[in-house]
Amino acid sequence: LEDSKSDKNLQKPTHFAVIFDSARKTFRNEIYADYKANRSEPPDDLVPQFEYIRKSVLAFNLPSVDLINYEADDLIATYTEQILAKGAKVTIVSSDKDLMQLYKKDVRLYDPMKNKFITSKDVIDKFGVNPKKIIDVQSLAGDSSDNVPGVPGIGIKIAAELINKYDTLEKLLDKAHEIKQNRRRETIIENK
């Protein structure tokens, strides 16, 4: 995997698109009504900027995509897989930690807030596992920023430790009775 701190490869993309979130409610709210329910409204001075960004994208005739009922993350992940299937490489420009699960060969992540490409070490430092296992870690630990509950008492660090030991969430749940720590074992079994 290419671990570069340079942004030189961002300067000449062959294709690109600006991906927007749709309205606040998405299909995830149909699955889990409290999804992102803890989010406060954006600051008043930020709200008008959303429309300015959309207008700027339109004024510069930049390709953009948004789809009702979907978040930008969903669209980015879908387009990434479609592009990889065609044998092309992908660079995602975003500071969203949830997109780290897309990091792999031929997919680079550039964090504009940190002005650097995300490396495999960055992913492991953040989640304690490789990108393919992030979803298992988040399933166990939950995601407070999205108001998604996990197993009580299991944070990212313990979730990563368990996933690294048992390889997948499914295997962990199948072998939960083998967990040595009584409280942890009981909590995971109770919350299957």
Task: Name the predicted role of every residue range.
Residues 37-192:
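Extended two-metal-dependent nuclease catalytic cores across DNA- and RNA-processing enzymes
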Residues 1-21, 27-30, 34:
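Non-catalytic, usually N-terminal nucleic-acid engagement modules in DNA/RNA processing proteins
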